[in-house]
Design a protein with these regions (language model features):
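Cytoplasmic-side transmembrane-helix entry/capping segments in multi-pass membrane proteins
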Residues: 90-100, 124, 147-153, 194-200, ...
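Selected transmembrane alpha-helices and immediately adjacent juxtamembrane segments
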Residues: 11, 15-60, 145-194, 201, ...
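Selective hydrophobic functional segments
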Residues: 66-119, 205-248
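Hydrophobic alpha-helical transmembrane segments in multi-pass integral membrane proteins
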Residues: 162-172, 208-216, 223, 260-270
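Transmembrane helix exit motif
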Residues: 77-88, 126-149, 259-270
Length: 270
């Protein structure tokens, strides 16, 4: 039997081995993962690209979210490794807060697994729209943070747990929310707080990914190219962000997010 194209060599079902995936599908996922990794580095909203890319390839909404979460695990590990200098002396704090976020991530995953798929489909447009608006007003939100160490510590722990649950459930723009909450709790430089955020967010994402891998419908065929893209984007992102004006970039991404939310909302509610 003759082979006429790379797509013919790699053609196969979405649920099979990634080696059998169509070349065009793999290319789309690598590209989406790369852009998602850049957005994750810049504005903490990788799902704005990768989630609709999975939907475009015919993956059901619930499975797309689970697949996206599993693919992000290596990105979290990479961000922690790259933040080792800033995490020096933060080990106990990361473990203490990481326990909270790990449990929260698992709880968010449990909510996703135990509720109907139709509920997730209906809620996602709201989550994406809300995340896009949070991104738009990000500087003002950060400006509202009180001095670290003040206020009710238990209230901050509850807020941290709630955001970690959101990480496990969907997670778009969760990094922004985590940065705000941790900024209230930790009396350190923004660079250090961001490094702690990367670590504890990675723990929430990891426990959610384990739950999805064990009990959910992860499309493993799509995980490898998407994860490869995330790794590439995570490396490119910091270099690119230094050269792009933050304000216009944030507004453009926010508007795209609102547009995506409207599109998904029309599809979900019609």
């Amino acid at each position: 039997m003759g082979i006429t194209s790379a797509e013919g060599v790699l053609g196969g079902a979405a649920g099979g081995s990634w080696l059998r995936m169509k070349f065009s599908e793999a290319l789309l996922l690598v590209a989406a993962g790369t852009l998602g990794g850049i957005l994750s580095t810049a504005v903490s909203i990788a799902s704005l690209v990768t989630y609709p890319a999975l939907l475009a390839l015919g993956v059901p909404p619930l499975s797309a979210n689970m697949t996206n979460t599993v693919s992000l695990v290596l990105t979290g590990a990479g961000s922690v490794l790259s933040s080792k200098p800033e995490l020096t002396g933060q080990g106990r704090r990361v473990i203490r807060l990481g326990i909270v976020t790990a449990i929260g991530g698992a709880a968010g995953a449990a909510v996703l697994l135990l509720t109907p798929a139709s509920t997730f489909t209906a809620v996602v447009p709201v989550l994406i729209g809300g995340a896009s608006l949070v991104l738009l007003v990000q500087p003002r939100i950060k400006g509202l943070s009180p001095s670290a160490g003040g206020g009710n510590k238990m209230a901050y722990i509850v807020a941290l747990f709630a955001v970690a649950m959101y990480v496990g459930y969907f997670g778009a723009a969760a990094g922004i929310l985590l940065l705000v909450v941790l900024g209230m709790m930790i009396d350190e430089s923004l660079v250090t707080v961001n490094a702690v955020k990367n670590a504890v967010s990675g723990m929430a994402n990891a426990t959610a990914a384990v739950c999805f891998a064990l009990f959910g419908d992860v499309r493993w065929a799509f995980v490898v190219p998407l994860a490869a893209g995330f790794l590439a984007g995570g490396w490119i992102g910091p270099k690119l962000v230094r050269k792009v004006p933050a304000g216009p970039f944030r507004v453009a991404v926010s508007l795209c997010g609102v547009g995506l939310a409207v599109r998904l909302g029309i599809s979900a509610y019609r």
